[in-house]
Regions:
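N-terminal helix-loop segment corresponding to the beta1-alpha1 unit
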Residues: 1-166
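Conserved Rossmann-fold dehydrogenase catalytic segment
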Residues: 103, 131-139, 162-178, 197-204, ...
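Conserved PLP cofactor-binding pocket of PLP-dependent enzymes
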Residues: 282-300
Length: 306
């Protein structure tokens, strides 16, 4: 909808359950969460079990470029709203089905909640610390990734339909989307038997690439994109001799000795404050950032520019 499409959301007669969610701030007396996900959309309330309402849904589908659903597999076919049923009267129609686990998985009929997808897709296993175990990724990774990949599929499918006059049916699964976002972890594990483990506040294959504590507040340092960042970093910290230490000669070696390196860095950073290091490392072109709270982020990016 934000890109200019007319989006018609079909809700049950009682409305999307998210409308009634009163957790957090309200917008005009309604759910702020619902507004976040649905602003710009039009809404129609229909009972698809009623023939008259089902006919209305079919008319909407046949007048649209794309029909998108997030039902469990088989539901759209039951209502005659699947691509095979509609394409006879609308050859250019694009159908996108987003589900938790796709249509042929043994889990196909299972409910696809975000936390379940995080668990089954490996995301939980690499989040958190080894001492405390897996931790919930505190945003809707599976939900959001599935929606984004579905949006990409829609854009590509509409382009094809406009060129050929024929639409297709596509499936997107939240689980596949979350696994794809795991990136290197899946690649390494699949090819070389890489043993994934919780990343804690850094990355086991990158160093220094982590959260570090200063004298007062933590910062993030990512001095691994190019060797010059590493050299600039250790120069600012006054430990340039590490460039000749065989344990830290390159990222591969630094990753193998990450605990030793982390201890050295922490010892240096804890002498000065966060703001001091942000200034000095920034001047040296070292990738560094403060760790902002969500409140600080909202204030920073909604405040008028000076």
């Amino acid at each position: 909808a934000d890109l200019g499409a007319e989006v018609i959301k079909i809700e049950p007669i009682s409305g999307d359950p998210l409308r009634a969610n009163k957790v957090g701030p309200l917008v005009s007396g309604g759910s702020a969460q619902f507004q976040t996900f649905n602003h710009g959309k039009k809404s129609v309330s229909l009972d698809l079990k009623e023939e008259n309402d089902l006919d209305k849904a079919k008319k909407i589908a046949l007048s649209s470029d794309v029909i998108f659903d997030n039902f469990r597999p088989g539901v759209m076919e039951k209502f005659g709203l699947d691509h095979a049923s509609l394409v006879k009267d609308h050859p250019a129609l694009v159908s996108i089905s987003l589900s938790g686990f796709g249509t042929i998985s043994p889990l196909a009929k299972n409910p696809g909640y975000d936390l379940i997808v995080q668990a089954l897709g490996g995301g939980l296993s690499i989040n958190g610390h080894e001492e405390t175990g897996p931790a919930h990724i505190p945003f809707h990774l599976g939900d959001t990734a599935g929606g984004l990949y579905a949006a990409i599929a829609i854009l590509a499918a509409v382009q094809e339909a406009q060129k050929t006059g024929f639409g297709r049916a596509y499936e997107v699964s939240m689980l596949d989307s979350q696994i794809h976002l795991s990136g290197d972890e899946v690649t390494f594990s699949g090819l070389d038997g890489w043993l994934s483990r919780p990343h804690g506040s850094g990355h086991p294959a990158l160093a220094p690439y982590a959260v570090f504590q200063t004298a007062d507040k933590p910062i993030v340092i990512a001095a691994v994109g190019a060797e010059k960042f590493w050299l600039n970093f250790i120069s600012v910290l006054g430990i340039s001799h590490l460039s000749e230490d065989v344990r830290f000669i390159d990222n591969s070696k630094r990753s193998m000795h990450i605990e030793e390196l982390t201890n050295i860095i922490h010892k240096k950073l804890k002498v000065k404050t966060r703001d001091f290091w942000l200034k000095e490392l920034g001047k040296a072109d070292v990738p560094v950032a403060p760790i902002l709270t969500v409140d600080e982020v909202c204030l920073l990016y909604t405040s008028p520019s000076p």
